[in-house]
């Protein structure tokens, strides 16, 4: 059983919800990332999404886009991000790690080379934001050869046809985007999300996580009631835009604790 499947099974047996954290690799400095990931796991993160810095992150709001700029300015590239996972794995062989990024850098490296190296470093799955399921078959074949999961996005605007494509191909978990827009946007419609997630879950046993717009205990708890996982990015990344590194790490870890406590109230 994959690390993702194992983690979701464990949580399900405990009637707990997964807290999935997004961190941009190399933000604000490459040496910050691995210690930060360990601290976040210690504070209650169940699954890590590691962002691959890219110069044109079209699906991301200003917080994540600026994080990508900081990481790139610090010299972080895609292979550096994979090596961070390798370093993380020296002390953590259990927490699933999913890479989240864009297609272009992966195509430049080549599917086989990228996936085999990612697997060797200890990566469990990949979410390429701009690779729709209809065009993802070739990449999926390579991932499956290496026992890795391909994570797909679904949104309030997804057609029935897109939902069918995703539930057929997805493994690990499905990432439901709770807002029409970019990451870190402001307003959440819990009722609409609940209806859409319920519809998706009638078609698949793959866990469904919900993200975009979750930034505090109240929104985490609300979404935790309707999904298997709550995915948080901007709220963890934001402190690094303005604070000294130590302060930013502390604030991010405290945010993890706040959200973990909120989700555990649902047990």
Curated annotation (Swiss-Prot):
Key words, A-Z: Amino-acid biosynthesis, Aromatic amino acid biosynthesis, Lyase, Tryptophan biosynthesis
One CC-aspect GO term: cytosol
Please give one Pfam family short name.
Trp_syntA
The answer to whether UniProt assigns keyword Lyase to this entry is: yes
The signal peptide stretch is: none
The reaction(s) catalysed by this protein are:
(1S,2R)-1-C-(indol-3-yl)glycerol 3-phosphate + L-serine = D-glyceraldehyde 3-phosphate + L-tryptophan + H2O
Highest taxon, organism lineage? Bacteria
InterPro entries named among the record's database cross-references: Aldolase_TIM, RibuloseP-bd_barrel, Trp_synthase_alpha_AS, Trp_synthase_suA
Catalytic center at which residues? 49 (proton acceptor), 60 (proton acceptor)
- EC number from the UniProt entry: 4.2.1.20
What GO molecular function terms would the record report? tryptophan synthase activity
PROSITE patterns from the xrefs?
TRP_SYNTHASE_ALPHA (PS00167)
Pathway of action? Amino-acid biosynthesis; L-tryptophan biosynthesis; L-tryptophan from chorismate: step 5/5
Name the protein family. Answer: Belongs to the TrpA family.
Q: What does this protein do?
A: The alpha subunit is responsible for the aldol cleavage of indoleglycerol phosphate to indole and glyceraldehyde 3-phosphate.
Q: Quaternary state and partners of this protein?
A: Tetramer of two alpha and two beta chains.
The name of this protein is Tryptophan synthase alpha chain
Q: What organism is the protein native to?
A: Acinetobacter baylyi (strain ATCC 33305 / BD413 / ADP1)
């Amino acid at each position: 059983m994959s690390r993702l499947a194992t983690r979701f099974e464990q949580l399900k047996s405990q009637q707990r919800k997964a807290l999935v954290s997004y961190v941009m690799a190399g933000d604000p400095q490459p040496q910050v990332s691995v210690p930060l990931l360990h601290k976040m796991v210690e504070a209650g993160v169940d699954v890590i999404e590691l962002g691959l810095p890219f110069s044109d992150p079209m699906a991301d709001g200003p917080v994540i886009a600026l994080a990508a700029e900081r990481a790139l300015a610090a010299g972080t590239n895609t292979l550096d991000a994979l090596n961070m996972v390798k370093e993380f794995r020296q002390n953590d062989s259990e927490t699933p790690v999913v890479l989240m990024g864009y297609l272009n850098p992966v195509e430049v490296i080549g599917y086989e080379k990228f996936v085999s190296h990612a697997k060797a470093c200890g990566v469990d799955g990949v979410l390429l934001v701009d690779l729709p399921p209809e065009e993802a078959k070739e990449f999926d074949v390579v991932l499956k050869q290496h026992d890795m999961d391909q994570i797909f996005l679904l949104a309030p605007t997804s057609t029935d046809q897109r939902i069918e494509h995703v539930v057929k191909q997805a493994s690990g978990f499905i990432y439901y985007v709770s807002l029409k827009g970019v990451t870190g946007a402001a307003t959440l419609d819990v009722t609409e999300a609940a209806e859409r997630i319920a519809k998706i879950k009638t078609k698949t046993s793959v866990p469904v996580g919900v993200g975009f717009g979750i930034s505090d205990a109240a929104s985490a708890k609300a979404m935790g009631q309707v999904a298997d996982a709550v995915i948080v990015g901007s709220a963890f990344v934001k402190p690094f835009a303005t604070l000294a590194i130590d302060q930013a790490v502390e604030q991010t870890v405290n945010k993890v604790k706040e959200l973990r406590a909120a989700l555990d109230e649902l047990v």
